[in-house]
UniProtKB/Swiss-Prot annotation:
[4Fe-4S] cluster 1 binds at C34, C38, C41. SUPFAM superfamilies: 4Fe-4S ferredoxins (SSF54862), Radical SAM enzymes (SSF102114). The keyword Oxidoreductase applies. Keywords: 4Fe-4S, Iron, Iron-sulfur, Metal-binding, Oxidoreductase, S-adenosyl-L-methionine. Its EC number is 1.97.1.-. This is 4-hydroxyphenylacetate decarboxylase activating enzyme. PROSITE patterns: 4FE4S_FER_2, RADICAL_ACTIVATING, RADICAL_SAM. Residues 20-307 form the Radical SAM core domain. GO terms for molecular function: 4 iron, 4 sulfur cluster binding; metal ion binding; oxidoreductase activity.
Length: 316
């Protein structure tokens, strides 16, 4: 009799020796899929669960006469200009399931943004890395939004706790109450993002309203969950750094007895990924957040009795 097939999850990266994603030295697992579409997103390749392709012009050897991908795309998504440079029709490419261009490329110019793992395969990676953590570390599930693959994640979490692996999550909390509560039963530490307190402004820049997000955070804060919760705010000048929004965040935290927040200054490190996905990056001209302004925001939280960490300087 054949054994039951294991659940598979789609993962776009696994990083060992992460020191900014929770207490101690950790393995961070990046799961595909996200209900948000933040205009500043550093990991836009994570938005869909299904595999899709990225193209790096810097890795492509078209200028050296390489033609290995010519004629490989049977769907007509791939053509070439007079300089031999690949030209991609992303409207066709997004529905591809065969990825002949990826399979043909010697130089990783075409690459997939998702790799399937079974539960046991991923747990084996985590257990292997646990030799590096010893008692100080664990695994952090990030994304994308890891809760979108909640059935797979739940099975992995159960196996992690069987071998006493500390579990953390980085989440938008933008999932149903049922899914959120089920997963958090097996979470020891959490970063949860608050992009903006105003629901309309939140939707304008992320594609979704924030009602469900705030509801899940409130429910968690007022439950008997005994893990550690740190809110995170990606600080973006002109979007969510106003006195009004900061005051609203503080009021929300006081109302729910939340005591820790992490301010992450905006960066453009993911811009090249947008180009590789054929997407327009609207934040290319957005300036960095002034360090002095970040210190002012930090002082406001501290003056209101909230532990506030800036960037990767956290109390771990």
């Amino acid at each position: 009799m054949s054994s039951q097939k294991q659940l598979e999850g789609m993962i776009f990266d696994v990083q060992s020796f992460s020191v900014h994603d929770g207490p101690g030295c950790r393995t961070t697992v990046f799961l595909n899929g996200c209900p948000l579409s933040c205009k500043w997103c550093a990991n836009p390749e994570s938005w869909t669960v299904r595999p899709h392709m990225m193209f790096s012009e810097l890795s492509c050897q078209y200028e050296n006469g390489c033609t290995v991908c010519h004629g490989k795309c049977k769907n007509g998504a791939l053509s070439f200009n007079l300089d031999n440079k690949p030209v991609i029709d992303w409207n066709i490419c997004k529905d591809c399931e065969s990825f002949e261009c990826v399979n043909s490329c010697y130089y990783n110019a075409f690459k997939l943004c998702a790799k399937p793992y079974t539960v046991d395969e991923l747990v084996q990676v985590i257990k292997r890395d646990s030799n590096n953590w010893r008692s100080n570390g664990g695994v952090t599930f990030s994304g994308g939004e890891p809760l979108l693959q909640h059935e797979f994640l739940h099975e992995v979490l159960l196996k992690c706790h069987e071998v006493n692996v500390h579990t953390a999550i980085e989440t938008s909390a933008c999932v149903s109450n049922e899914v959120f509560n089920k997963i958090f039963n097996d979470i020891d530490f959490a970063f949860i993002d608050i992009k903006h307190m105003d629901r309309e402004k939140h939707k304008e820049q992320t594609g979704v309203y924030n009602d469900l997000i705030l509801e899940n955070i409130s429910n968690l804060a007022n439950s008997d969950w005994n893990g550690r919760l740190v809110l995170r705010v990606p600080v973006i000048s002109g979007f969510n750094d106003s006195d009004e929004n900061i005051s609203d965040i503080i009021s929300f935290m006081h109302k729910n007895n939340l005591v820790e927040i992490n301010l992450l200054p905006f960066h453009r490190l993911g811009e090249s990924k947008w180009t590789q996905l054929g997407k327009e990056y609207e934040y290319s001209d957005k300036g960095d957040v002034d360090e002095g302004h970040l210190e002012e925001l930090q002082d406001i939280f501290l003056d209101n009795g909230i532990a506030c960490y800036v960037g990767h300087v956290t109390a771990f």
